[in-house]
């Protein structure tokens, strides 16, 4: 009996060793894959453009959006249109001074757009909906209120989706949203959003968390083992307040948030790639006469760099716009210079997240920096 028992025991031992070897091999394989993955954490205040950057990675480095995904987005896009009209028209009575409809006969269309029928989740947005939207949106009073959108909360893509050409496309029964439609579609981000992609055999994992104050408590869960942080700020928000209250300037909120991230004890060795985003909207606002000094008094005494290469600046850039974009850049860089210990660095870039070519160029220029950070992280450099 003992002989047979010993043979069985030997077989069990051999099998256990074999299993242990397989486990060790898998662990080494997993560790190698884990260390090869470049983790990019997207942070920033609400509505800065973080989820748009993730969409761009899907367009640039994956297969883009399938027809099925595009059709699914159509509901969100039409919901955006409804929300735009409701937001602007509800704000009319709350502005100081308030604004009235230019044509009282549009009141009937307005009541329809405010009705419970239109706000149902299963609403099918018939021709009647788009006719009412057109009548109300082109009302002179509504247009006046729309021009004062910095006084309330209106999504950046309002002008894009409310353009008559886009409205005509969207009401077509077989319309399939294009990349710009999807990039500009606004859905409030809650929880973690992510994408994985490969560029020149290098594996990236880009992920982020909603930027509203209530979402930020989840950020700490994401800090572990990140290669770099991409901090996104909406430079165009200099004359706006945050959704959570009616007095905190959005850009100052971003500055405070950036300072907290830069000085966070868990992130003192993690460098930050700073996306100074929404440069297109910033330019539109400056060209329309919006004054930065009304919100940031220090803008009056600011002097932009003397060595600007104008050939690398956006075509048609006014001196005021160039001054504004570098003013905001330098406000963030002052934070990094104030408490710089040489353990992490900040790399600023001007971005327009809805511009695929711009994001392609910026990300390409960041890749070498990201890979260097990754090698330093694992002491391979």
From Swiss-Prot:
GO terms for cellular component: cytoplasm; heterotrimeric G-protein complex. Mg(2+) binds at residues 51, 189. Residues 351-356 are annotated as: G5 motif. Keywords: GTP-binding, Lipoprotein, Magnesium, Metal-binding, Nucleotide-binding, Palmitate, Transducer. Residues 204-213 are annotated as: G3 motif. The keyword GTP-binding applies. Residues 273-280 are annotated as: G4 motif. GTP binds at residues 44-51, 183-189, 208-212, 277-280, 353. Guanine nucleotide-binding proteins (G proteins) are involved as modulators or transducers in various transmembrane signaling systems. The G(s) protein is involved in hormonal regulation of adenylate cyclase: it activates the cyclase in response to beta-adrenergic stimuli. G proteins are composed of 3 units; alpha, beta and gamma. The alpha chain contains the guanine nucleotide binding site. Belongs to the G-alpha family. G(s) subfamily. This is Guanine nucleotide-binding protein G(s) subunit alpha.
